[in-house]
């Protein structure tokens, strides 16, 4: 992508010389998770079997960012098939501690943004792949509402769960990027027509903030606990809330089933044996185990998902924002499987 980046940057310079600006992203370099198609540029999904894969056209998000003047600096490393931070090139390192990984699967996007290698990056999330590396690398990740950002031209892992969002170094930047990549796309059948509205004059006086006490227990870090104190010191009225007692973790079987269906050919051909990560919890084993789920299991999981969606809707009838560690308790599963932003 080096030649492409220079060509796009030169094009932005020429427009600038003519006093033409394409907007706030004019000339800003960004990194793109290597799940998104880039015409005639390798998009390997971090996985050995897909090396040398050359897409015929750009993903929708690439087109939108180019139209806004952003410069594609490079593709960022992704955990193989959107899981973990291990790919065919090794493990994506954490810029703050090179002995640690960046978490995944938007590992390279978070690592590169944290290291200042790009102005922002694009990531995806099925279950924690924006929020986890952002927490790990100290970036600000935004996982938008399901369907808000087009996935056209992006590797499909789980049709009912995959989401696309920005990884930046501050909150304001995530809003700016979302305003550009947001919007309906007829080529993504799950796309929704949700306008982006931001009122800088709106006060926070009436903002209702909730938290789940159980997620701030003994295993929670002091930094997480400090958040409650900071929010309270800012004058907000914190409300303790509870989420319905449901077997949330069971929904992960839906993720495994959809992912196994997406890569059934990989499993049946035994090419998943070439993936670098072969642990018990890695994709090759998960794909195979998912084939033992019955039709009855799927019906029951769909019923459970409906109950989780209803529980989340009921929760947000009383609050506007829920704060807490995203990976403690049921919220990582509940919010992803109900399509809520984070």
Residue ranges with predicted function:
Residues 1-10, 233, 287, 291-292:
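An N-terminal boundary/leader segment
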């Amino acid at each position: 992508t080096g030649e492409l980046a220079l060509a796009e940057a030169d094009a932005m310079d020429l427009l600038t010389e003519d006093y033409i600006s394409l907007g706030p992203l004019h000339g800003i370099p960004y990194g793109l998770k290597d799940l998104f198609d880039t015409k005639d540029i390798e998009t390997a999904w971090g996985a050995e079997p897909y090396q040398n894969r050359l897409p015929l056209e750009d993903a929708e998000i690439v087109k939108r960012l180019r139209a806004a003047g952003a410069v594609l600096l490079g593709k960022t490393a992704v955990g193989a098939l959107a899981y973990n931070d291990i790919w065919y090139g090794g493990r994506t390192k954490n810029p703050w501690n090179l002995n640690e990984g960046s978490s995944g699967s938007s590992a390279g996007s978070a690592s590169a943004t944290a290291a200042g290698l790009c102005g922002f990056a694009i990531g995806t999330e099925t279950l924690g792949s924006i929020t986890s590396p952002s927490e790990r690398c100290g970036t600000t990740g935004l996982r938008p509402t399901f369907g808000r950002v087009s996935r056209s031209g992006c590797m499909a892992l789980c049709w009912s769960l995959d989401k696309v969002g920005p990884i930046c170094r501050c909150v304001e930047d995530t809003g700016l990027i979302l305003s550009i990549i947001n919007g309906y796309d007829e080529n993504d059948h799950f796309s929704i027509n949700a306008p982006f509205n931001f009122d800088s004059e709106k006060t926070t006086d009436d903002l209702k903030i909730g938290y789940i006490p159980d997620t701030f227990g003994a295993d929670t870090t002091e930094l997480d606990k400090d958040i409650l104190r900071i929010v309270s010191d800012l004058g907000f009225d914190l409300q303790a809330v509870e989420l319905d007692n449901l077997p949330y973790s069971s929904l992960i079987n839906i993720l495994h089933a959809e992912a196994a269906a997406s890569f059934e050919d990989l499993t049946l051909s035994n090419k998943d044996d070439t993936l670098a990560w072969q642990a018990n919890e890695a994709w090759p084993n998960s794909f195979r185990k998912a084939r033992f789920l019955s039709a009855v299991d799927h019906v029951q999981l769909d019923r459970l998902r409906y109950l989780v969606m209803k529980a989340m809707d009921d929760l947000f009838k009383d609050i506007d924002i829920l704060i807490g560690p995203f990976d403690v308790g049921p919220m990582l599963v509940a919010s992803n499987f109900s399509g809520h932003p984070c």
